[in-house]
Amino acid sequence: FIIDGESVFQLNTEYYSAIVKNGGIPLGVFSSDYCIQNNNSNFLSDESISDLDNILSKCNGILMTGGYNWNKCDEYILEYALKNDIPILGICLGMQIMGSMDFFNSDMPDRTIRNDTIINHFQKGKQYVHKCKILDGLLYKILKKNSIVVNSRHNYHIEDRKYFNIDAYSEDGLIEAISIENHKFALGVQWHPESMIDYDEDMFKIFKAFIEASIQS
Protein backbone atom coordinates (compact mmCIF):
# COMPACT_ATOMS: atom_id res chain seq x y z
CA PHE A 1 0.00 0.00 0.00
CA ILE A 2 1.04 3.63 -0.48
CA ILE A 3 0.35 5.75 2.62
CA ASP A 4 1.42 9.42 2.67
CA GLY A 5 3.72 8.73 -0.26
CA GLU A 6 5.48 5.81 1.42
CA SER A 7 5.32 2.09 0.64
CA VAL A 8 3.77 0.08 3.47
CA PHE A 9 3.73 -3.72 3.65
CA GLN A 10 1.00 -5.46 5.61
CA LEU A 11 0.50 -9.10 6.54
CA ASN A 12 -2.65 -10.30 8.25
CA THR A 13 -1.61 -11.87 11.56
CA GLU A 14 -3.88 -14.84 10.80
CA TYR A 15 -1.38 -16.06 8.18
CA TYR A 16 1.44 -15.75 10.70
CA SER A 17 -0.53 -17.57 13.40
CA ALA A 18 -1.60 -20.39 11.09
CA ILE A 19 2.02 -21.08 10.17
CA VAL A 20 3.37 -20.84 13.72
CA LYS A 21 0.61 -23.03 15.18
CA ASN A 22 1.69 -25.80 12.81
CA GLY A 23 5.40 -25.56 13.59
CA GLY A 24 6.54 -23.23 10.81
CA ILE A 25 8.63 -20.06 10.94
CA PRO A 26 7.23 -17.21 8.78
CA LEU A 27 9.57 -15.15 6.60
CA GLY A 28 8.32 -12.24 4.51
CA VAL A 29 9.64 -12.11 0.94
CA PHE A 30 9.39 -9.07 -1.34
CA SER A 31 11.61 -7.23 -3.81
CA SER A 32 13.44 -3.97 -3.14
CA ASP A 33 12.21 -2.75 -6.53
CA TYR A 34 8.63 -2.96 -5.29
CA CYS A 35 9.51 -0.51 -2.52
CA ILE A 36 11.64 1.83 -4.61
CA GLN A 37 9.26 2.02 -7.55
CA ASN A 38 6.18 2.55 -5.34
CA ASN A 39 4.21 -0.47 -6.55
CA ASN A 40 5.51 -0.50 -10.14
CA SER A 41 4.41 -4.05 -10.87
CA ASN A 42 6.21 -4.25 -14.22
CA PHE A 43 9.75 -3.81 -12.91
CA LEU A 44 12.09 -6.39 -11.41
CA SER A 45 15.81 -5.65 -11.68
CA ASP A 46 18.63 -8.19 -11.94
CA GLU A 47 19.79 -7.12 -8.49
CA SER A 48 16.34 -7.71 -7.05
CA ILE A 49 16.13 -11.13 -8.72
CA SER A 50 19.48 -12.04 -7.18
CA ASP A 51 18.23 -10.95 -3.75
CA LEU A 52 15.03 -12.95 -4.20
CA ASP A 53 17.00 -16.04 -5.21
CA ASN A 54 19.11 -15.72 -2.08
CA ILE A 55 16.07 -15.44 0.20
CA LEU A 56 14.00 -18.10 -1.57
CA SER A 57 16.86 -20.60 -1.41
CA LYS A 58 16.38 -20.56 2.37
CA CYS A 59 12.62 -21.23 2.19
CA ASN A 60 11.17 -24.72 2.62
CA GLY A 61 7.64 -23.65 1.64
CA ILE A 62 5.90 -20.73 -0.04
CA LEU A 63 2.58 -19.27 1.15
CA MET A 64 1.00 -17.05 -1.52
CA THR A 65 -1.38 -14.87 0.50
CA GLY A 66 -4.58 -13.05 -0.35
CA GLY A 67 -4.63 -9.42 -1.46
CA TYR A 68 -5.97 -7.02 -4.07
CA ASN A 69 -3.40 -7.25 -6.88
CA TRP A 70 -0.13 -8.91 -7.74
CA ASN A 71 3.15 -7.89 -9.31
CA LYS A 72 6.29 -9.27 -10.94
CA CYS A 73 7.71 -10.20 -7.55
CA ASP A 74 4.75 -12.50 -6.82
CA GLU A 75 5.06 -14.08 -10.25
CA TYR A 76 8.79 -14.65 -9.80
CA ILE A 77 8.32 -16.22 -6.36
CA LEU A 78 5.75 -18.65 -7.72
CA GLU A 79 7.89 -19.48 -10.74
CA TYR A 80 10.88 -20.15 -8.46
CA ALA A 81 8.81 -22.43 -6.22
CA LEU A 82 7.47 -24.41 -9.17
CA LYS A 83 10.87 -24.84 -10.82
CA ASN A 84 12.54 -25.85 -7.55
CA ASP A 85 9.71 -28.08 -6.31
CA ILE A 86 9.12 -26.06 -3.15
CA PRO A 87 5.74 -26.72 -1.47
CA ILE A 88 3.17 -24.01 -2.26
CA LEU A 89 -0.08 -23.01 -0.60
CA GLY A 90 -1.99 -20.28 -2.44
CA ILE A 91 -4.86 -18.51 -0.68
CA CYS A 92 -7.49 -16.39 -2.48
CA LEU A 93 -5.34 -14.08 -4.66
CA GLY A 94 -2.51 -16.57 -4.17
CA MET A 95 -4.63 -19.27 -5.80
CA GLN A 96 -5.58 -16.89 -8.59
CA ILE A 97 -1.90 -16.27 -9.32
CA MET A 98 -1.31 -20.03 -9.42
CA GLY A 99 -4.30 -20.46 -11.72
CA SER A 100 -3.47 -17.59 -14.06
CA MET A 101 0.23 -18.12 -14.65
CA ASP A 102 1.38 -20.88 -16.99
CA PHE A 103 5.15 -20.57 -16.80
CA PHE A 104 5.62 -23.39 -19.26
CA ASN A 105 3.50 -21.77 -21.97
CA SER A 106 4.53 -18.57 -23.75
CA ASP A 107 0.88 -17.63 -24.31
CA MET A 108 -0.20 -15.81 -21.16
CA PRO A 109 -3.90 -16.39 -20.35
CA ASP A 110 -6.28 -13.74 -19.07
CA ARG A 111 -5.84 -13.31 -15.36
CA THR A 112 -9.18 -13.35 -13.56
CA ILE A 113 -12.88 -12.84 -14.22
CA ARG A 114 -15.29 -10.80 -12.09
CA ASN A 115 -17.87 -12.90 -10.25
CA ASP A 116 -21.41 -12.84 -11.65
CA THR A 117 -23.19 -15.78 -10.04
CA ILE A 118 -26.04 -16.46 -7.62
CA ILE A 119 -23.77 -16.53 -4.55
CA ASN A 120 -22.28 -13.36 -3.08
CA HIS A 121 -18.65 -14.45 -2.77
CA PHE A 122 -17.52 -11.33 -0.94
CA GLN A 123 -18.89 -11.58 2.60
CA LYS A 124 -16.39 -10.34 5.16
CA GLY A 125 -16.83 -11.46 8.74
CA LYS A 126 -18.99 -14.51 8.02
CA GLN A 127 -17.66 -17.80 9.36
CA TYR A 128 -19.36 -19.84 6.63
CA VAL A 129 -20.78 -18.72 3.27
CA HIS A 130 -21.19 -21.67 0.88
CA LYS A 131 -20.46 -25.34 0.28
CA CYS A 132 -17.65 -26.69 -1.87
CA LYS A 133 -17.77 -30.00 -3.72
CA ILE A 134 -14.38 -31.69 -3.45
CA LEU A 135 -13.08 -33.73 -6.38
CA ASP A 136 -10.35 -36.34 -6.43
CA GLY A 137 -7.05 -34.58 -5.87
CA LEU A 138 -4.67 -33.16 -3.29
CA LEU A 139 -7.39 -31.46 -1.25
CA TYR A 140 -9.35 -34.71 -1.01
CA LYS A 141 -6.20 -36.56 0.10
CA ILE A 142 -5.79 -34.05 2.92
CA LEU A 143 -9.39 -33.84 4.13
CA LYS A 144 -10.88 -37.19 3.03
CA LYS A 145 -14.22 -35.44 2.44
CA ASN A 146 -16.51 -34.96 -0.55
CA SER A 147 -17.71 -31.53 0.56
CA ILE A 148 -16.95 -28.76 3.04
CA VAL A 149 -18.39 -25.35 3.94
CA VAL A 150 -16.10 -22.34 3.66
CA ASN A 151 -15.97 -18.59 4.15
CA SER A 152 -15.69 -16.31 1.11
CA ARG A 153 -14.36 -12.83 0.37
CA HIS A 154 -13.36 -12.53 -3.27
CA ASN A 155 -14.78 -10.59 -6.21
CA TYR A 156 -12.92 -12.46 -8.94
CA HIS A 157 -12.37 -16.07 -9.98
CA ILE A 158 -10.32 -18.13 -12.44
CA GLU A 159 -11.33 -20.44 -15.26
CA ASP A 160 -9.98 -23.88 -16.12
CA ARG A 161 -6.53 -23.50 -17.70
CA LYS A 162 -5.93 -27.24 -18.26
CA TYR A 163 -2.43 -27.13 -16.72
CA PHE A 164 -3.78 -27.49 -13.17
CA ASN A 165 -6.20 -29.90 -11.53
CA ILE A 166 -9.53 -28.63 -10.23
CA ASP A 167 -9.86 -29.87 -6.66
CA ALA A 168 -13.13 -28.18 -5.67
CA TYR A 169 -16.10 -26.22 -7.03
CA SER A 170 -18.55 -23.91 -5.28
CA GLU A 171 -22.29 -24.56 -5.54
CA ASP A 172 -22.57 -21.99 -8.33
CA GLY A 173 -19.78 -23.55 -10.38
CA LEU A 174 -16.76 -21.39 -9.55
CA ILE A 175 -13.36 -23.03 -9.10
CA GLU A 176 -12.62 -23.07 -5.36
CA ALA A 177 -9.46 -25.16 -5.17
CA ILE A 178 -6.70 -26.26 -7.54
CA SER A 179 -3.54 -28.34 -7.42
CA ILE A 180 -0.58 -28.80 -9.75
CA GLU A 181 0.59 -32.28 -10.73
CA ASN A 182 4.19 -33.46 -10.62
CA HIS A 183 4.92 -31.10 -7.76
CA LYS A 184 5.72 -32.03 -4.17
CA PHE A 185 2.83 -29.95 -2.79
CA ALA A 186 1.02 -27.22 -4.74
CA LEU A 187 -2.47 -26.40 -3.49
CA GLY A 188 -4.54 -23.28 -4.05
CA VAL A 189 -7.82 -22.45 -2.29
CA GLN A 190 -10.12 -19.53 -3.05
CA TRP A 191 -11.42 -19.12 0.50
CA HIS A 192 -9.48 -18.04 3.60
CA PRO A 193 -8.55 -21.06 5.76
CA GLU A 194 -6.25 -18.91 7.91
CA SER A 195 -9.38 -17.19 9.26
CA MET A 196 -11.04 -20.51 10.10
CA ILE A 197 -8.40 -22.66 11.80
CA ASP A 198 -9.58 -21.80 15.32
CA TYR A 199 -13.08 -23.15 14.70
CA ASP A 200 -12.77 -25.54 11.75
CA GLU A 201 -10.55 -28.62 11.96
CA ASP A 202 -10.44 -29.03 8.17
CA MET A 203 -8.72 -25.67 7.75
CA PHE A 204 -6.16 -26.63 10.37
CA LYS A 205 -5.49 -29.81 8.39
CA ILE A 206 -4.74 -27.81 5.24
CA PHE A 207 -2.03 -25.78 6.98
CA LYS A 208 -0.73 -28.86 8.77
CA ALA A 209 -0.32 -30.69 5.44
CA PHE A 210 1.44 -27.67 3.93
CA ILE A 211 3.87 -27.27 6.84
CA GLU A 212 4.60 -31.01 6.95
CA ALA A 213 5.38 -31.01 3.23
CA SER A 214 7.63 -27.97 3.77
CA ILE A 215 9.52 -29.61 6.64
CA GLN A 216 10.13 -32.68 4.49
CA SER A 217 11.35 -30.68 1.47
Name what the model sees in each region:
Residues 102-110:
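Post-Walker A helix-loop "phosphate-sensing" segment adjacent to the P-loop in P-loop NTPases
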Residues 187-191:
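Active-site-proximal beta-strand elements of phosphoester/diester hydrolases
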